[in-house]
Curated annotation (Swiss-Prot):
The keyword Ion transport does not apply. Heme binds at residue 426. Disruption phenotype: Severe reduction in root and shoot size. The gene is CYP716A12. Its EC number is 1.14.14.126. The lineage of its organism: Eukaryota, Viridiplantae, Streptophyta, Embryophyta, Tracheophyta. Disulfide bonds: none annotated. This is Beta-amyrin 28-monooxygenase.
Length: 479
């Protein structure tokens, strides 16, 4: 019996070891508890459906259809060639914005890196972005922006006199882009000659079209045109930078007059100054960020005020009270803008319904769990403004235009996110508020209007844009 006993003991030991190894192997190889969802077709994933809902004017459909299907505020998919977790709702916004550089970091598609290549040999686009965010706050904080209000008003007045006055009909979106781009050129690098600014305008539109196109670098493709446009603008910016360096040396330019001067005179922790190509890259990024989203907001302000006369009347009343309180010819100032409370609530409601920034990507820098689901390192995460902006749990009757949502304490935290949030919140948020309010003031003082195409379609690609650029019929106020 003894041999049988030892044989049984050996078999028991082997069985135990085998089961242990199987358990360890199975645990390591078992699938992660990923959020529910489908990855779509090979390579393209669900990118076409993600984009097509925007082209049809309802980008939120991609989000809400899947939230309902999976009964979850997190779902997995594959977009822009990446395994992605789409994070919906205020709790997701809070989690992502609060864990920047802890669990997640900013991420851009490769196409963006190719259109905006960093010129620093030891940095990447993320590191350059971090450096910029350390540089910008002193220019975009309210106390610094106060001195720009009058300049913005001068530029807005000239813009309306030149492009709106004495016109029966105008097309809003191109003019809104012209206004915000001229402001950015003037305030970031003191360029205000419209002919000089116009030289940049068309290439910038090519860049905007190429960023969201397929990254196919062949002659004639939008992506190829965007790369060429980026290179052209860089060369033009370097000419401006070289001249500013001369002007600073000769004392004809001020060290504090704009961001460009500051960049030329700023050195890093090692005492090294930025080279001209590096500065050109940063100014290029600022010019894009400084006018694209604001021009969308201004365009949709015109759209909604044209559709909602009762809202227009309240904005007009507030703006005329401010105008009548000032001596003739006096420019707007900081105190005037602080009085535009209802007007800003209207602007916020516009950005809730038509957020210029539809969402943003992050990349998981480590494995982590969220809401009971595994998020693997390297996966991308996408937050969506529409997941809260058009969610009845966050904003009752979400399709109704109601500026009173922003009275008092306003919306609940992390539900209204037109500028993002956390460390990556748009540093130009206050700057955007100024340019939008100055635009609104000069607009409603001059005109009422109606849409030429009452049911004009909206396209989101990647910003919301009226399909025909919003033509309107102008009715000047009688003197």
């Amino acid at each position: 019996m003894e041999p049988n006993f030892y044989l049984s003991l050996l078999l028991l030991f082997v069985t135990f070891i085998s089961l242990s190894l199987f358990f360890i192997f199975y645990k390591q190889k078992s699938p992660l508890n990923l959020p529910p969802g489908k990855m779509g077709y090979p390579i393209i994933g669900e990118s076409l459906e993600f984009l097509s809902t925007g082209w049809k004017g309802h980008p939120e459909k991609f989000i809400f259809d899947r939230m309902r299907k999976y009964s979850s505020e997190l779902f997995k998919t594959s977009i822009v060639g990446e395994s992605t977790v789409v994070c919906c709702g205020a709790a997701s916004n809070k989690f992502l914005f609060s864990n920047e550089n802890k669990l997640v970091t900013a991420w851009w598609p490769d196409s963006v890196n190719k259109i905006f290549p960093t010129t620093s040999l030891d940095s990447n686009l993320k590191e350059e972005s971090i450096k910029m965010r350390k540089l910008l706050p002193q220019f975009f904080k309210p106390e610094a922006l106060q001195r720009y209000v009058g300049v913005m008003d001068v530029i807005a007045q000239r813009h309306f006199v030149t492009h709106w006055d004495n016109k029966n009909e105008i097309t809003v979106y191109p003019l809104a882009k012209r206004y915000t781009f001229l402001l950015a050129c003037r305030l970031f690098m003191s360029v205000e000659d419209e002919n000089h600014v116009a030289k940049f305008s068309d290439p910038f539109q090519l860049i905007a079209a190429g960023i969201i196109s397929l990254p196919i670098d062949l002659p004639g493709t939008p992506f190829n045109k965007a790369i060429k446009a980026s290179n052209f603008i860089r060369k033009e910016l370097i000419k401006i930078i070289k001249q500013r360096r001369v002007d600073l040396a000769e004392g004809t330019a001020s060290p504090t007059q704009d961001i460009l001067s500051h960049m030329l005179l700023t050195s890093d922790e090692n005492g090294k100054s930025m080279n001209e190509l590096n500065i050109a890259d940063k100014i290029l990024g600022l010019l894009i960020g400084g006018h694209d989203t604001a021009s969308v907001a201004c365009t949709f302000l015109v759209k909604y005020l044209g559709e909602l006369p009762h809202i227009y009347d309240k904005v007009y009343q507030e703006q005329m009270e401010i105008a009548k309180s000032k001596p003739a010819g006096e420019l707007l100032n900081w105190d005037d803008l602080k009085k535009m409370k209802y007007s800003w609530n209207v602007a916020c409601e516009v950005m809730r319904l038509s957020p210029p920034l539809q969402g943003g990507f992050r990349e998981a820098i480590t494995d982590f769990m969220f809401n009971g689901f595994s998020i693997p390192k390297g996966w991308k995460l996408y937050w969506s403004a529409n997941s809260t902006h058009k969610n009845a749990e966050c904003f009752p009757m979400p399709e109704k235009f109601d500026p009173t949502r922003f009275e008092g304490n306003g919306p609940a935290p992390y539900t209204f996110v037109p500028f993002g949030g956390g460390p990556r919140m748009c540093p130009g948020k206050e700057y955007a508020r100024l340019e939008i309010l100055v635009f609104m003031h000069n607009l409603v003082k001059r005109f009422k209007w109606e849409k030429v195409i009452p049911d004009e379609k909206i396209i989101v690609d990647p910003f919301p844009i009226p399909a025909k650029d919003l033509p309107i019929r102008l009715y000047p106020h009688k003197a």
